[in-house]
Amino acid sequence: MQQKHKIASKCAPVRSRYPVMKPILAALVFLCFLPVKLFADNEVLIVADEFPAMQVLAGKLKAEENVTSQIVAQTNMPADLSRFAAALVYIHRDLGEPAEKAFIAYAKSGGKLIVLHHTISSGKRRNKEWFPFLGVTLPEGDVSQGGYQWTEGVTLDIVNLAPNHFITTNKVNYPAQIAFQAADSAAEKTLPGFTLTNSEVYINHVLSGTRTLLLGLKYTDARTGKLYMQSHAGWVMPSGKGWTIYLMSGHSARDFENPAFARIVANAVIWKP
């Protein structure tokens, strides 16, 4: 019994010799994990096939919100998108099936997918899952009968349809007040907005499913004189555990240099649903 007592007394000082180690180890564990979260919160993935406009956008995101952008082609996408705070897609030409599936899976798994400009366009009709996932149809036929039409080199107005939403309001300075009447409204309203020149407009998107309309467009066709006021220039919708945001503008770097539009894109990136 005496020997056991000696062993116990020898061991006791060992347990108390380094009382400071436990908090140090805890702090080290915390610091090891902290940079990973900060990195994820401050980096976005931009997948594009036209890069000058995205370089302008990346510069805006860095300057305004200290967000770092990784810009890649769809063939060079990381295998795992989940670490990015948002994935922005700016694809004019064909959207490959692997990228299509990756974007959809990212959003449904809890990611924030931001679909820009011509990532909704007639060429994407060939994709099996893209338009059904987005709840978008681009009808064929003449525009006067409701068919989809794109026109570039135009001047158009963009108006705020969601005066209480973070994406359309946070730090956004709308320089104009624009008369606008939505198709489902009996009355014309004056809404805050901005004008884009030498841009591109998409007419007659047909939307289905639940979403919040963010932006409307107002455009006069120079060839026919017809005035269009439509409500699909920006929207946000739930996608599984995540979200999908669409912004129609972005024809060229010039659109992303517009302060109001650049701020709206930045808001979409930092928005926390």
Question: What feature does the model see in each segment?
Answer:
Residues 2-3, 21-24:
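Positively charged n-region of N-terminal signal peptides that target proteins for export
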Residues 15-20:
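Short, Lys/Arg-enriched N-terminal segments with co-localized hydrophobic residues
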Residues 26-37:
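Bacterial N-terminal signal peptides
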Residues 41-43, 52-53, 208, 218-273:
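Extracellular ligand-binding/catalytic regions of CAZymes and related secreted enzymes
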